[in-house]
């Protein structure tokens, strides 16, 4: 029995460290348009160059989702397929994936495909991909994996910490005044992905130290009790290490991974940003 785990580049993994038996992981890239340049978010992307270009232009940058054809190509070669997308509130990737699924099943009726809207990005998507791999590795049937991953998604959340908000300002999602204040006063925006997949501000913390404590407080308030965490970060390892230490003071057995953000997640998190997925009880 052949399996595929597919994720768009709202997931930070380019490949899985230890794929389950008979399982292939495929990353399907979104593209990021900065002025007249288009950056494809695959393993060859120079994220530093993309970010430099983005900050050098006054125009709003934007992302474009994979086409149904991109997903159709990714489906080939497996009988059991799971596909995880970035939240449908930020991208059309989920709609594109659903369309591709319907087209593919017309010609391949014996294939099983389950598409998951993560309602999130970054670390929480990474957790869902890791869990799918674990469930397949346990030898479960397709239907059992669907049931288990659906239940698991109810127990995962996303917390974000943003040190820069240039993109939000350029795209009109945040006022220029707030953007200026964030930059001048060293403010960090601490927020979460809501139940419907929108980004929701929780706190404003001044400086790195206070943002670490604010992130920890929100984590515990949301129900974290020592489970798995994936910190997807854009040039922010110091903050991640400090937050990891703070978490382990209370939960010494916490399983914490730190990953660099994909191009798309770097686009949203910006420099110094963190998109942290975590499990709750």
From Swiss-Prot:
Residue ranges of every copy of the DegV domain listed in the record: 3-280
MF (Gene Ontology): lipid binding
SUPFAM superfamilies: DAK1/DegV-like
InterPro entries per UniProt: DegV (IPR003797), DegV_C (IPR043168), DegV_domain_contain (IPR050270)
Tagged with keyword Metal-binding: no
Source organism, top-level taxon: Bacteria
PANTHER family linked to this entry: DEGV DOMAIN-CONTAINING PROTEIN DR_1986-RELATED (PTHR33434), FATTY ACID-BINDING PROTEIN TM_1468 (PTHR33434:SF2)
Name of the featured protein: DegV domain-containing protein spr0652
Originating species: Streptococcus pneumoniae (strain ATCC BAA-255 / R6)
Species lineage: Bacteria, Bacillati, Bacillota, Bacilli, Lactobacillales
């Amino acid at each position: 029995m052949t399996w595929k785990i597919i994720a768009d580049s709202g997931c930070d993994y380019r490949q899985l460290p230890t794929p389950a038996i008979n399982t292939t992981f495929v990353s399907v890239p979104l593209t990021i348009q900065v002025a007249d340049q288009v950056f494809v978010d695959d393993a060859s992307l120079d994220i530093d160059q993309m970010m430099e270009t983005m900050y050098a232009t006054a125009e709003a940058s934007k992302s474009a989702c994979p086409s149904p054809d991109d997903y159709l190509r990714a489906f080939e070669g497996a009988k059991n397929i799971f596909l995880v997308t970035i939240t449908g509130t930020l991208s059309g990737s989920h709609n594109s994936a659903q369309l591709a699924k319907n087209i593919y099943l017309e010609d391949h009726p014996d294939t099983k495909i389950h598409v998951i809207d993560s309602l999130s990005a970054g670390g929480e998507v990474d957790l869902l991909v890791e869990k799918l791999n674990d469930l397949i590795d346990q030898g479960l049937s397709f239907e059992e994996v669907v049931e288990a991953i659906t239940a698991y998604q109810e127990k995962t959340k996303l917390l974000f910490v943003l040190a820069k908000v240039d993109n939000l300002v350029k795209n009109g999602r945040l006022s220029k005044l707030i953007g200026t204040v964030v930059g001048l006063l060293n403010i960090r925006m601490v927020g979460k992905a809501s139940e419907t997949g929108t980004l929701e501000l929780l706190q404003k913390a001044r400086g790195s130290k206070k943002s670490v404590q604010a992130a920890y407080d929100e984590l515990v308030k949301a129900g974290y009790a020592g489970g798995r965490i994936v910190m997807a970060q854009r040039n922010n390892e110091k903050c991640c290490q400090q937050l990891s230490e703070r978490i382990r003071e209370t939960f010494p057995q916490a399983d914490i991974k730190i990953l660099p953000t994909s191009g798309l997640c770097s686009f949203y998190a910006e420099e110094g940003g963190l998109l942290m997925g975590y499990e709750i009880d």
